[in-house]
Amino acid sequence: MKWDEPPLWPVAVPSLAGFAAACIPYVFPNTPQLVGGELTTPFILLMIMSPLLYFSPEPTGGRAELILGANIGMFFAFLPQAIFFVWFIIVILLWLAQSMYVWRRNYPAFRIGTWIGLGAVSGLFIGGLFGHLILV
């Protein structure tokens, strides 16, 4: 998939969804925690919401590949955080770098999905910091 101009939805929608999911436990304090960790429940919510990519605009390519790529991108971006504390910085910088040039080249739907997954988890990390530092 190659766009003629920078697209807004693959950058804004996943990162805003991750940001909102990370802020939910802070806005609604009685939110049930499915498993331990502040961001694990919002991450599971993002995984549950990933099939909504099926309704993405047509030019993105294969819908199943897009969803699979987003899920793998989210796992790649989220799971190392348990071991490597500053992993979120790497994920956010990688997503920003990808956002600058991924739209200029012709990539398959799976690669676009990994970019979307990185954006969702970047929003999750930024929303977690925002919730912990501002909303508490």
Task: Pin down the residues of each PLM region.
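The cytoplasmic-loop to transmembrane-helix boundary for the fourth helix
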Residues: 115-122
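Lipid-exposed faces of alpha-helical membrane segments in multi-pass integral membrane proteins
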Residues: 13-20, 90-93, 123
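Juxtamembrane boundary at the C-terminal end of a transmembrane helix
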Residues: 124-136
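Membrane-associated alpha-helix detector
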Residues: 1-80
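Membrane-helix boundary connector in multi-pass membrane proteins
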Residues: 78-115
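Membrane-helix interface motif
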Residues: 27-28, 88, 136
